[in-house]
Design a protein with these regions (language model features):
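Transmembrane alpha-helical segments of integral membrane proteins
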Residues: 83-99
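Short alpha-helical packing/oligomerization segments
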Residues: 2, 60-87
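Interfacial loop-to-transmembrane junctions
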Residues: 96-116
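Hydrophobic alpha-helical transmembrane segments in multi-pass integral membrane proteins
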Residues: 51-63, 113-128
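Hydrophobic alpha-helical transmembrane segments
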Residues: 8-12, 72-77, 110-111
Length: 128
């Protein structure tokens, strides 16, 4: 495959995978992040941003270190599972997290976003 085609394949696939992750992540949370963000809810924005960036770090590492396109897709699905599992674990450890985000507790949103970002960094490093 010509390098430009490989580039376009990974770029377009990455964009689609980000959209899929975004849809899944916002579906599993019990509140509507987009509506909250439109209302100016900083906690929801921080939480969602951390999850998306954490996922993107794993996508980038997968593109860099995978032997082929199929492995890139496999690791991407794995990253979705890890990020979603991280959300589930944090909200189980901190049951007030969801309510705090809905009520625009920016500190809790930052904590959730930072935890998601940290998980994404570790997950990305595991692929190298």
């Amino acid at each position: 495959m010509l390098p430009v085609y490989a580039y376009l394949l990974h770029l377009l696939s990455g964009c689609v995978l980000i959209a899929v992750f975004f849809a899944i992540y916002t579906w599993i949370t019990p509140f509507d992040e987009i509506a909250l963000i439109r209302e100016g809810n900083m906690a929801a924005a921080l939480s969602l941003a951390g999850a998306v960036v954490g996922f993107c770090l794993t996508l980038a590492s997968s593109i860099l270190h995978s032997d082929g396109y199929e492995m890139f897709l496999l690791w991407s699905v794995g990253a979705m599972v890890v990020q979603s599992g991280g959300y589930a674990a944090i909200t189980r450890m901190l049951p007030q997290m969801n309510g705090a985000i809905e009520h625009n507790n920016a500190a809790m949103g930052a904590l959730m976003g930072t935890a998601s970002l940290a998980l994404g960094i570790i997950n990305a490093a595991c692929l190298s």
